[in-house]
Every structure is written in structure tokens, then in C-alpha cells.
Amino acid sequence: MKSSLALALLVGGAIASGPQQQVLREPVDHPQAAETPLQKISDIFGHLSEQAGNVWEDVMDKFPDTLMDAITQTPPPKKHNRRPDSEWDHIVRGSDVQAVWVEGDAGEKHRKVGGRLDTYDLRVKAVDPSNLGVDTVKQYSGYLDDNENDKHLFYWFFESRNDPKNDPVVLWLNGGPGCSSLTGLFLELGPSSITKQLKVEYNEFSWNSNASVIFLDQPVNVGYSYSSSSVSNTQAAAKDVYALLTLFFEQFPEYSRQDFHIAGESYAGHYIPVFASEIMSHSHRNINLKSILVGNGLTDPLSQYPHYRPMACGEGGYPAVLSSSSCQAMDNALPRCLAMIQACYNTESRWSCVPASIYCNNALIGPYQRSGMNPYDVRSKCEGGSLCYTQLDDISKYLNRNAVMESLGAEVSSYESCNMDINRNFLFQGDWMQPYMRVVPTLLAQMPVLIYAGDADFICNWLGNKAWTEALEYPGHNEFAAAEMKNLTSQNHEDVRVIGQVKSAGNFTFMRLFGGGHMVPMDQPEASLEFFNRWLGGEWSDKSP
């Protein structure tokens, strides 16, 4: 699940706290503050240019106190209790894997797998399917440990229900940044969901119907993962994910021979292109990466942010949520927002990217948040707290049960679905507005890329995702931009059922899924499993030599 709106609006939500607050307040004089806040900003972010200083002064005039509190807040370490090595079925030492050298075809010696692995270990527990009843298939859970930096990432693997010896392997990532991928497991595409009575309920449309799936809690301090340190940008998280996959496939080489895909949603629109690039940067690897899939993602803010106003104001296929005056205010704010995002793109520095996040989220997402409607589904009101889904409370209660934590080998004292501290860290590192779509052209030269979007989502809406795919500069740009949106028809029924629209050219595919919100597998489980299986089967990949 994405970023909660509190996430997306760390400032637009936490700072724009009241429903009556204007999108941006008029500047207020704070004579006692003088220049001290800006000096503190300079201490944190480094030297500010005159232009950047002016932007920060303006932003801090509008959010004088809570902004500094958010920037300087240091969260306490997550409580945990590490289990002894004797409780694990397998431990893979990264130093052992790194030490293996092999001989190439030309007689040259090289490491079997690239990348720095010596600080990492992988702990593996064989999960007894009968204990929890989530699925009957073979399962593993455990931790990737970065011993040098005291980081511990939790994962849960489910083998395919169909033909695990031949079916592909998929890594699933929820977004946030700071939301657990166990949300995806129990709310969207995993083998079971959790009822209000905290019972597991079988999901016939689970994505492990024809693929083995790894659910990963990342970055650290998300879900069951923990650390005394932190990760606050996508590039740093990519190193951890590469290490986890490398050690996992070293322990289970039978899965490394299968095709491998990375899928996720929301802020995974940042994660996935960078994680895939990290994997492909190693010429010697045991990860057979074949494609990536991003659902309702945030990848190119400059192309996507102009579509918040149309989606909220009745131009995305659903009735308007906001009043005409709110829509006009969003239009008025857009030019400045885009100028700030462009400045971030030009420098890729914190001092440009952080103000863009603060201003744009407040001006273009804030009005929708204050409407009380669900940012993940324009058809419904927000219920159950800032994340808008009461089911998340049931999932958290289930995953906080001692019996569940014991069965999985979890080492934290408690589970929470989203960690707002992680979100804040990423935002104030400037990661939110970074132009990560710039790595996609290189990926398109290597593998198929699917961008799909449920068309009822606001926060990462289909209009914006279609726009950035059509704007992407790469050799196939003209062909893809000119490609026709065609009906996506289900092949699982005798009668004709149109489940969405799709356009595809070369290795690039965009898909609009009808009736799906931010979490397509939750809203349209049968349709999502169908397009997923068809994608893994290569239906839209480039067949040219």
C-alpha cells in the first residue's frame, strides 16, 4: 500500500492539520525566530544557494514550527530481541558467498556473484504451514542481516501452488515509504486475508497461484524489520535488496533457475526501477531478472503531479470530489509546484527536492485529504484512520499475536503496518521528488516493463501514470506515445468482459484497470491475477530479436 496520506502529506497532513486550513497560509511574521531556522536548515542540508535559501524561507514562513520539529526529530530504535542462531534452519554467510571465485569461458577468474556481501547474512526458518494455515505450500521466513550497520530485513516466502519447479519467482514490495509488504500479503494478493475475527481466509486469486512470491519488509524498521540505524533513500535500500536476493538464491538454487520478476505498488514506483538497476549492474549474479511491474506508482512527479487536479475534479472517469474553488486553487498552485520539481530534477539535491515535496503535497494533495474522501479510492470516504482501511487494524492485531510472531521467527516487540518515521526520513532526504524514471530507459533495453493503474485511485492515479509513460524519453518514445489504448478483455470467461485498457510498444506497457483503486488486487482480485499471469507469460513483451 502506498504511502498513507499521512505519508504522502507528512507536511500536508501533519502540518496542514485542520480541515479549515488554507492550502498555503499567508506568510506570518515571527520576529523571535529571526534567521535561526534557516541557519539550522543550512546546518542540516549544507550550503544553500541564494535561490534555495529564498525558497526555504518562504516554506518556513508558512510552516514555522512544526517543520523544524519534523526535520530534526530522531525516532527511538525499534524494540527487538534477536533469536539465537540455533533457532534457524539455515544461515547463509555473505562472506562465504563473496569468497567464491569461478573460471569464465575464456579462462578468466571472477567472483561467482558480484557486489559487496561480506557484511550480510541470511537467516532462514522453514515455516510449518499447519501452524498458521495461511497456505499449504512450502514457506520460508527470516531475516537479512547487515551486521556492519545493524540492519535486519524480514521476508516471508511462499512457493507456487502450481508448479514450483518451473513457475517464476516474484518479489512483492509495498510502498510508503515505510509500509509493510505484509499488507500486500493479507490485504491484496497473498494466499489468505485476515477476517475481523482474526482468522485466515483462503484467497483463490492469490498471486502465488502460478508463481512463488517473496514478501519483503523494507526498508529497515518497516513491519517486522528493525535496525538501530536507518535507510532514508531508495539507492541505499537497493543494496540491501540485492544482498537479500543473492543470498536467498544461494541457499535455494532451485529457485534461482526460474525467471524472476519484481512487482509492487505506490512508492515502489521509486523502489523498483532502482532495485532492478542495482541487480542488472552486476554482470555476475544469480538473479534471473526478467521484468518489472509497478502498480499505481510514483515514478516521475513532474509528469504526474499535474494530474491531481483533473483526477479530483471529475476528469478521470469518476465524479468530482472537490469544489470548483478548490480545483481552481490547485490550478493556480501548479506552475510553482512544477518549477520547484524541475529545480529538484536539475540538481537532485535535498535543498531543492525537499521544498518541492512540502509545497506540492500541501497544495495539490492537501485539498483532497481535507475532503474526507479516500485518497486510494475516489468512490468512497476515508474510514479507519489515516490509512482509510479498517482491515489494516485486523492485520496488525493478527501479526502482533505471539503465536504468529513465534511461528515466523519475528524478533521485534510489535508490528505496525506503516512507519511514519521512515516516510519522514525519505522526504527530508529529498527522495520523494527524485527523477527515478531516468533509469527506466536502460531497463527497457534489457527487459519488459509494465506500469498498471487502478483507475479509481487518486494518490497515484492512472492519468499521471499514463502521462509519465508517454513522456518518457527513450529510443522507443514515439512508437509508445503513438500506440493506441485498446480494450483489455478477460480470457477467463465465455462472454466478453472488458477489464481495462492497455497500450504497448516494444518492451513498454501501460495498463488501466477498471474499477480498481490504489490496491488493484484487493479491488479486482480476479482481473489482477489474470493480467499478472498473462504478463508473466510474456503476452505484451517485445518479441523482436
Curated annotation (Swiss-Prot):
Gene3D superfamilies on file: 1.10.287.410, alpha/beta hydrolase (3.40.50.1820)
Swiss-Prot/TrEMBL catalytic activity: Release of a C-terminal amino acid with broad specificity
UniProt keywords, alphabetically: Carboxypeptidase, Disulfide bond, Glycoprotein, Hydrolase, Protease, Signal, Vacuole, Zymogen
Keyword Protease included in the entry's annotation: yes
Known EC number: 3.4.16.5
Pro-peptide region(s): 19-125
Primary location recorded for the protein, binned into one broad class: other
Cellular component aspect of the GO annotation: fungal-type vacuole
Record carries keyword Secreted: no
Signal peptide: 1-18
Active site residues according to the UniProt entry: S266, D457, H518
Glycosylated position list: N210, N487, N507
Cellular localization per UniProt: Vacuole
GO function term, MF aspect, one: serine-type carboxypeptidase activity
Disulfide bonds: C179-C418, C313-C327, C337-C360, C344-C353, C382-C388
Listed GO biological process terms: proteolysis
Family: Belongs to the peptidase S10 family.
Role summary: Vacuolar carboxypeptidase involved in degradation of small peptides. Digests preferentially peptides containing an aliphatic or hydrophobic residue in P1' position, as well as methionine, leucine or phenylalanine in P1 position of ester substrate.
UniProt-recorded name of the protein: Carboxypeptidase Y homolog A
Species name: Ajellomyces capsulatus (strain NAm1 / WU24) (Darling's disease fungus)
Lineage: Eukaryota, Fungi, Dikarya, Ascomycota, Pezizomycotina
